């Protein structure tokens, strides 16, 4: 029996593998060059902090979530921050911001304040997504005079009976191990051959993402790519995993506050979002019926909510029952 067909098949598979890996190396190089060139290092009183900024107007500090960096912060603000001076830092351990011995949310909040001072900014709107929320809350508690408004998007917050994190499904846990192992190639490959697994790991029901528009699916693809290179973000991811959340004295927060979460967020941020809104006087809570942790197909709705909130903000009278809960049918 001739072995030529098997040799030909092996040669084709080898060529495909070489081509795939070469494509990965090229894309990773471009991503690395882009992220290396986009940030600036501020030598603050809290140590060096990488950041980027764009736009003019009222200052808006945008704090990224897990797996991010200043680039993710800019992406978060791209739909609603066009009329603002957006400042997007890389949190401790992400990209070029080193991790100090004290990497707690309180220390990170002090670092945010140090960056604002370095830039000559007295007060700023503070927007935080996911794992960026703890330091944003600490900022509002520790330095209230520096915060003009607080916006928390699918936030990691305290709840007495519920913690957040990747769901326990096999796909999510496999991708989690890839991320924890800083395996750039495996993550890149998973985006192409097991997209639904990565989508689920990022907190979105795969069927929600599949039904989204092509434009929205491309936004999800860009958010996926923003995790690369993992090797430049893995220390920050580790620190987020080590950070424990304790109950805050939320009743002390007096700035206008907007919180947005989703019913189907697989990271289960909604219970904590409700708890947080209930304990901050005058806070607004908006619950999206679908969209998951990335708020898929909800970009226009979220932007509208934020713009309306910022246009109408003013201090609310203190009340334990002041949280307004609204279901957004979008």
Name each model-derived stretch:
Residues 1-38, 118, 316-330:
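Short amphipathic, positively biased membrane-proximal segments
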Residues 50-96:
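Conserved HGGG/HGGXW glycine-rich cap/lid loop of the alpha/beta-hydrolase fold
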Residues 107-124:
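Conserved acidic catalytic loop of the alpha/beta-hydrolase fold
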Residues 150-182:
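Flexible "cap/lid" loop of the alpha/beta hydrolase fold
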Residues 170-174, 181-249:
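Alpha/beta-hydrolase
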Residues 253, 259-261:
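Short beta-strand/loop motif that positions the catalytic acidic residue
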Residues 266-272:
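Conserved alpha/beta-hydrolase "acid-adjacent" motif
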Residues 283-330:
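Catalytic active-site module of serine/aspartate enzymes centered on a nucleophile-bearing elbow/loop
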């Amino acid at each position: 029996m001739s072995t030529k067909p098997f040799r030909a098949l092996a040669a084709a598979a080898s060529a495909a593998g070489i081509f795939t890996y070469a494509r990965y190396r090229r894309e990773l190089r471009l991503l690395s060059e882009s992220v290396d060139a986009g940030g600036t290092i501020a030598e603050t009183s809290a140590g060096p902090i990488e950041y980027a900024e764009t736009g003019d107007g009222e200052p808006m500090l945008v704090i990224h979530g897990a797996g991010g960096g200043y680039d993710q912060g800019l992406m978060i603000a791209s739909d609603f921050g066009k009329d603002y001076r957006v400042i997007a830092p890389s949190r401790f351990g992400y990209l070029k911001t080193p991790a100090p011995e004290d990497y707690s949310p309180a220390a990170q909040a002090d670092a945010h304040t140090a960056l604002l001072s370095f830039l000559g900014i007295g007060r700023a709107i503070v927007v935080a997504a996911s794992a960026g929320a703890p330091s944003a809350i600490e900022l509002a508690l520790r330095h209230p005079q520096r915060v003009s408004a607080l916006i928390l998007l699918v936030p990691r917050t305290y709840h007495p009976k519920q913690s957040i994190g990747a769901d326990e499904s096999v796909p999510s846990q496999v991708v989690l191990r890839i991320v924890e192992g800083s395996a750039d190639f495996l993550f890149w490959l998973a985006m192409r051959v097991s997209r639904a697994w990565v989508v689920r790991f990022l907190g979105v029901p795969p069927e929600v993402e599949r039904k989204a528009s092509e434009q929205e699916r491309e936004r999800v693809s860009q958010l996926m790519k923003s995790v690369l290179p993992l090797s430049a973000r893995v220390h920050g991811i580790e620190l987020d995993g080590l950070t424990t959340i304790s109950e805050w004295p939320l009743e002390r927060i007096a700035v206008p506050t907007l919180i947005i979460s989703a019913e189907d967020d697989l990271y289960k941020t909604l219970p904590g979002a409700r708890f947080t809104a209930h304990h901050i006087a005058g806070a607004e809570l908006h619950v999206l019926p679908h969209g998951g942790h990335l708020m898929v197909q909800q970009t226009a709705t979220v932007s509208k909510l934020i713009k309306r909130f910022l246009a109408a903000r003013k201090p609310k009278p203190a009340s334990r029952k002041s949280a307004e809960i609204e279901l957004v049918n979008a």
